[in-house]
């Protein structure tokens, strides 16, 4: 089976590439060149028939991913499907099913069947439930069986923590971290490696993993098991050593035509974000960077969507290609529907803010909003807002008598004052 990368290397412009070119207003040659060298990916499993393809990477708009899925404390698949509907409503490009309890295949199959967004999973989360074995009883190649099952089901990308090999684990042991390993999948693999005194199975059998990805054109999202879970731990030796391992694994994947993106931090002080984005691009030769925030402070519990949006905007402006959303429930509980909505909007704002910095053409919508505000065209403002539904609701909650203003300024509305005086009309505030 040929992947999007293989086709690009041969100069074949696939239907998925055509769709992305139209969405992003990019030339055929630009896309082919950058997909062929790994700087742009189009995650598109051959079995995901409902997919509306999107590209991730150099010269493209920053994409947003929404996490959802059940846990052993909250098993309500109907609520998770409502989260999917909400993600579709906001035109989210990627959805990850992070279910980590029970038999997850039925929900995943339904997700692939109905979702136009690219679907991602973390197969190691599913290992115990799928294999019906406790962690210590799982064999190295058993993990590949889970990967194969996910790939065959139609998921477009998978988080695989192949970089936490014995070398990276040794460096981690010497680190003086406050929060150790905060990656759920990374902690499971590290525990397995320690209990079995064995190499990371995804690293040991990486070539077999690539064969599975090739068969279904699954994009590898190389997970950062050693990402910092606190600002104290950011940019330490453990994080960077794993990134170096991921850079080597990226080249091995590219050599056979498997598409790759790199996952990144995490928690990180705002002044460290730009250099971390540059470091990933340098080490991984421009591979798309998918960051989890980053959260710029550790004390925002209940408001971590704000911390994540601040970091995400800086990351996107500095080269990050996809942002994983963060909700107000982060670090506290499984998010509900309102949490998901708040997380989506905050992250879309961050992504767009970053795009304004790196893609000048993305300012057009903001300019239209500014014109609508000057013209006091409320319906146009609601239409242009990222969450126009909330904007309209808030306006109507204290709807003014005079629609040439809002209830904040009334007759002292600066826009209305200037519109009148510049037309030569008298301004009355009485």
Swiss-Prot record:
Record EC number: 4.1.99.17
Residues involved in substrate binding: 67, 96, 125, 161, 183-185, 224-227, 263, 290
The record's listing under InterPro entries reads:
ThiC, ThiC/Bza_core_dom, ThiC/BzaA/B
Pathway given for this chain reads:
Cofactor biosynthesis; thiamine diphosphate biosynthesis
Extract the GO molecular function terms from the UniProt entry: 4 iron, 4 sulfur cluster binding; carbon-carbon lyase activity; zinc ion binding
Sorted alphabetically, the Gene Ontology BP terms of this entry are: thiamine biosynthetic process; thiamine diphosphate biosynthetic process
Annotated cofactor note:
Binds 1 [4Fe-4S] cluster per subunit. The cluster is coordinated with 3 cysteines and an exchangeable S-adenosyl-L-methionine.
Short name of one Pfam family: ThiC_Rad_SAM
S-adenosyl-L-methionine: is it a keyword of this entry? yes
Enzyme class, UniProt record, top EC level: lyase
User: Which cofactor does the UniProt annotation name?
Assistant: [4Fe-4S] cluster
Function according to Swiss-Prot or TrEMBL: Catalyzes the synthesis of the hydroxymethylpyrimidine phosphate (HMP-P) moiety of thiamine from aminoimidazole ribotide (AIR) in a radical S-adenosyl-L-methionine (SAM)-dependent reaction.
Q: Which PANTHER family match?
A: PHOSPHOMETHYLPYRIMIDINE SYNTHASE, CHLOROPLASTIC, THIAMINE BIOSYNTHESIS PROTEIN THIC
Q: Which family does it belong to?
A: Belongs to the ThiC family.
Put simply, this protein is called: Phosphomethylpyrimidine synthase
GN (gene name): thiC
């Amino acid at each position: 089976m040929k992947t999007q990368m293989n086709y690009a290397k041969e100069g074949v412009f696939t239907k998925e590439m055509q769709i992305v070119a139209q969405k992003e207003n990019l030339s055929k040659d630009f896309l082919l060149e950058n997909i062929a060298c790994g700087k742009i990916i189009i995650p598109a499993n051959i079995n995901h028939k409902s997919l509306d393809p999107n590209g991730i990477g150099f010269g493209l708009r920053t994409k947003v991913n929404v996490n959802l899925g059940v846990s052993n404390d909250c098993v309500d698949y109907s609520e998770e499907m409502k989260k999917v509907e909400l993600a579709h409503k906001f035109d989210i490009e990627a959805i990850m099913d992070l279910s980590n309890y029970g038999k997850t295949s039925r929900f995943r199959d339904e997700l692939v069947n109905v979702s136009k967004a690219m679907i991602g999973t973390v197969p190691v989360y599913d290992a115990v439930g799928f294999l019906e074995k406790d962690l210590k009883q799982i064999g190295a190649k058993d993990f590949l069986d889970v990967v194969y099952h996910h790939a065959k089901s139609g998921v477009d990308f998978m988080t695989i923590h192949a970089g936490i090999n014995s070398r990276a684990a040794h460096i981690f042991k010497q680190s003086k971290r406050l929060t150790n390993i905060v990656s759920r999948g990374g902690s499971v693999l590290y525990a397995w490696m320690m209990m079995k005194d064995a190499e990371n199975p995804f690293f040991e059998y990486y070539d077999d993993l690539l064969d599975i990805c090739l068969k279904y054109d699954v994009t590898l999202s190389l997970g950062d098991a050693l990402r910092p879970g606190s600002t104290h731990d950011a940019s330490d030796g453990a994080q960077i050593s794993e990134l170096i391992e991921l850079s080597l694994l990226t080249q091995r994947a590219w050599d056979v035509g498997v598409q790759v993106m790199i996952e990144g931090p995490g928690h990180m002080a705002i002044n460290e974000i730009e250099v971390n984005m540059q470091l990933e691009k340098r080490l991984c030769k421009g591979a798309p960077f998918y960051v989890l925030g980053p959260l710029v402070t550790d004390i925002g519990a209940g408001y971590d969507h704000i911390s994540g949006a601040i970091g995400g905007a800086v990351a996107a402006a500095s080269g990050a290609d996809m942002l994983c959303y963060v909700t107000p429930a982060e670090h506290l509980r499984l998010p509900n529907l309102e949490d998901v909505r708040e997380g989506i909007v905050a992250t879309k704002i961050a992504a767009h803010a970053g795009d304004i910095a790196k893609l000048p053409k993305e300012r057009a919508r903001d300019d239209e909003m500014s014109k609508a505000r000057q013209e006091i065209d409320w319906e146009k403002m609601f239409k242009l807002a990222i969450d126009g539904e909330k904007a309209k609701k808030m306006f109507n909650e204290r709807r003014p008598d005079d629609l040439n203003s809002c209830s904040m300024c009334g007759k002292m509305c600066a826009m209305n004052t200037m519109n009148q005086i510049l037309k030569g009309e008298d301004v009355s505030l009485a």
